[in-house]
Amino acid sequence: LSKITAYLNMLTKRGCDIGEPYIKHLEDEIWELRPLRDRILFAYFDNNEFILLSVFMKKTQKTPKSEIQKAKRNLKNYMDRRREYEKQTF
C-alpha cells in the first residue's frame, strides 16, 4: 500500500511526465500506474487532474483488454455525470 501511495503522490506532483517505469500510456485517454504487480488504470486531464478508473493485479505480460475496456466505460460514465453536473450547476 505504501508503494501505491508513493506512486500516486509522484503522479500528483509531476503528472504524466514521470514516465516509465512508473506509468505507461495504454491507448486513447487511458494510462497505467505500475506499482509492483498492482495496476491502476487512470485518465489524466490537462489541468493536472486525474481520475482512477480501475484497479487490478496484473498476472500476464500484457494488460488485459477487458481491463482497458472497463476503464473506458468508467471514464465515459464519469464524463457523462460531470457534464450533467456542470449543466445543473451553471
Q: Where would I find each of the regions flagged by the language model?
A:
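Basic, Lys/Arg-enriched alpha-helical interface segments
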Residues: L1-R37, D46-F50, M57-F90
